[in-house]
């Protein structure tokens, strides 16, 4: 194999996005074991928190097994080299919760906003920079904007101080051309580093990540065993192997990654991470990945096929935070109304 001449940084989100695959039930001991394995493998940024991000442990998004600061401290204490990061979604997280995460030991924050709403990131990005954090920013549901308008949003994020701006395929709706075009547009528009976050609903998460790198992305997200919302993320250990085969230097060691995935993560999984019908249609319809489990529950409750609910949600252009629309659509498709207690039961 030839000596790699290009470099890409792998960021692992098993302990944040991957939380969605285990109903946010990783314990602090689980977090410590996984973080230690990632650190030994050379992963230098590890994202930790509730699956939706800081402050999301709730009846709306599901209760986690521990608090965000407990998770952060467990990870910080377990690593020797890696930075521990958290996800901050304006409207869910607060600056007080971010401050608590800083006190617990994070050195990186990832601020995530819908792809048309970069303005919402200004306050947390500026606060984080003032407090000495590395700031990565997410343009969620990036498939909903064409490349040039997406790049305009990236320019705003850079102006607030973002160190990295991510193209984020929150729905797993992109194919490689979509990923490449959007990253290339950002590369022309900003000087900040560019990242790419894939979901695997159409089975092309790894291909999308490789194409993103070819077009200028230098940070690539993954999760061990592909854990993550709906169909899951690009699989970290597969990314490491694929990038090495493609001639890229990642700085991580493949076999320690595989060992952590097989010996630590796999026994904690409650079900295989697969592209089932719901995950596939979710990506096809371009619906946010966190709609996965609520849509399945609504389909069972109202006796409506999940695909019909997701296709209608896609037609309505729903975004993250509009999960209440799932029940509205399921009820309409079922041709009956629902009362408030029934809705709360979803």
Curated annotation (Swiss-Prot):
Q: Where does Mn(2+) bind?
A: 17, 197, 199
Stated EC number for the protein is 4.1.3.39
Reaction catalysed?
A: (S)-4-hydroxy-2-oxopentanoate = acetaldehyde + pyruvate
The Gene Ontology biological process terms listed for this entry are: catabolic process; L-leucine biosynthetic process
Q: Does the keyword Lyase apply?
A: yes
Marked site (Transition state stabilizer) residue numbers: 16
- All copies of domain Pyruvate carboxyltransferase, residue ranges: 8-258
What is the uppermost EC class here?
Answer: lyase
What's the domain of life for this entry? Bacteria
Task: Give the protein name, as stated in the record.
Answer: 4-hydroxy-2-oxovalerate aldolase 2
What organism is the protein native to? Nocardia farcinica (strain IFM 10152)
Q: What is the lineage of its organism?
A: Bacteria, Bacillati, Actinomycetota, Actinomycetes, Mycobacteriales
């Amino acid at each position: 194999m030839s000596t790699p001449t290009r470099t890409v940084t792998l960021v692992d989100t098993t302990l944040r996005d991957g939380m969605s695959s285990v109903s946010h039930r990783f314990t602090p001991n689980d977090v410590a074991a996984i973080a230690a394995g990632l650190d030994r493998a050379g992963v230098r940024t590890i994202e930790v928190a509730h699956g939706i991000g800081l402050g999301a442990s709730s009846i709306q998004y599901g209760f986690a097994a521990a608090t965000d600061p407990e998770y952060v401290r467990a990870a910080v204490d377990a690593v020797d080299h890696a930075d521990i990061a958290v996800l901050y979604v304006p409207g869910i997280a607060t600056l007080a919760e971010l401050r608590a995460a800083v006190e617990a030991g994070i050195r990186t924050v990832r601020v995530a906003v819908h792809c048309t709403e970069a303005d919402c990131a200004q306050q947390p990005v500026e606060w984080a920079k003032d407090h000495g954090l590395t700031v990565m920013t997410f343009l969620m549901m990036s498939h909903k904007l064409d490349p040039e308008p997406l790049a305009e949003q990236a320019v705003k994020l850079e102006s607030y101080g973002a160190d990295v701006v991510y193209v984020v395929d929150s729905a797993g709706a992109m194919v490689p051309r979509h990923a490449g075009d959007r990253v290339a547009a950002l590369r022309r528009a900003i000087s900040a580093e560019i990242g790419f976050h894939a979901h695997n609903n159409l089975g092309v998460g790894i291909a999308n990540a490789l194409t993103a790198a070819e077009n200028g992305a230098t940070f690539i997200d993954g999760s061990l065993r592909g854990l993550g919302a709906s169909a899951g993320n690009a699989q970290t250990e597969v990314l490491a192997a694929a990038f090495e085969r493609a001639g890229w230097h990642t700085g991580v060691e493949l076999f320690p990654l595989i060992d952590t995935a097989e010996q630590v993560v796999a026994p904690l999984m409650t079900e295989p991470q697969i592209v089932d019908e719901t995950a596939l249609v979710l990506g096809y319809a371009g619906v946010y990945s966190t709609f996965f489990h609520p849509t399945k529950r609504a389909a069972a409750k109202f006796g409506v096929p999940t695909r019909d609910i997701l296709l209608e949600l896609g037609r309505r252009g729903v975004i993250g935070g509009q999960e209440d629309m799932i029940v509205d659509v399921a009820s309409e498709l079922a041709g009956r109304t629902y009362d408030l207690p029934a809705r709360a039961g979803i």
